[in-house]
Amino acid sequence: MIRAENITLIRTGRRLLDDVSVDLKPGKVNVIIGPNGAGKSTLMKVLSGEMRAEGGSVTYNNVALPQFTPVQLARMRAVLPQNTQLAFPFTALEIVRMGAVAQGSRAPEEQARRALARAGLRGFEQRSYNMLSGGEQQRVQFARALAQVPNSVENGEARALFLDEPTASLDIGHQISVLETARDFASGGGLVLAILHDLNLAAEFADQLIVMHGGRVTASGPSLDTISDETIARVYGIGGVVGRLPARHIPYVLPQSRHR
């Protein structure tokens, strides 16, 4: 379990995170939603160990995050950042291999090839990363994360995937494929934390939704309880857009319905 308690982070006089507390459990897909500037990526960076907050604490299985070395953290969790651009002319295989090396694999190239296949990129091994489309680059970076945590559980402890807008550059087919792979990782006992702007995908795939606004968590729980007209109006400033799919009781957001 990853637990954050009373996280506060201030930069250039601005409070980016304000007394944020979350519990992330293995076996679950946790999704953060909220408007631009809500603090979503900042919270993920604090939870993954990339940034340190001024106040509060983060623990992995009851051990304080600062107690882990970078090598230990690299073997416990993998991060797909929002920005996937690189300045150097690596091949797709070389980039994904970096994830396998960080994990300490004894066969990093083989592990990288398997991860590329899981991301639907078999045959891309020798393609130049900088010549790929934005969506293909996104999937290569997703494969790198999969190579870094190839198994949901290692030595009895859950591994974690941190995915910052993993569907941002993808077509609908690959959006669903990436999220299904993430869900499979969670189903195997791993922990997934993703940031999504597509509320319909968030509603479908999240076991726990975390709604952020103004650096605070304003709601959390199953999508059926958290995605409502009231929440959308308060957080995004539009109203009358949420419906329900009768068969599975999954909420869906239809922006056109605001014109009723």
UniProtKB/Swiss-Prot annotation:
InterPro entries: AAA+_ATPase, ABC_transporter-like_ATP-bd, ABC_transporter-like_CS, P-loop_NTPase. It is found in: Cell inner membrane. It is a peripheral membrane protein. GO terms for molecular function: ATP binding; ATP hydrolysis activity. The keyword ATP-binding applies. GO terms for cellular component: plasma membrane. Part of the ABC transporter complex HmuTUV involved in hemin import. Responsible for energy coupling to the transport system. It comes from Agrobacterium fabrum (strain C58 / ATCC 33970). PANTHER family: HEMIN IMPORT ATP-BINDING PROTEIN HMUV. It comes from the Bacteria. This is Hemin import ATP-binding protein HmuV. It is an enzyme of class 7 (translocase). Its EC number is 7.6.2.-. Residues 2-239 form the ABC transporter domain. Belongs to the ABC transporter superfamily. Heme (hemin) importer (TC 3.A.1.14.5) family. Keywords: ATP-binding, Cell inner membrane, Cell membrane, Membrane, Nucleotide-binding, Translocase, Transport.
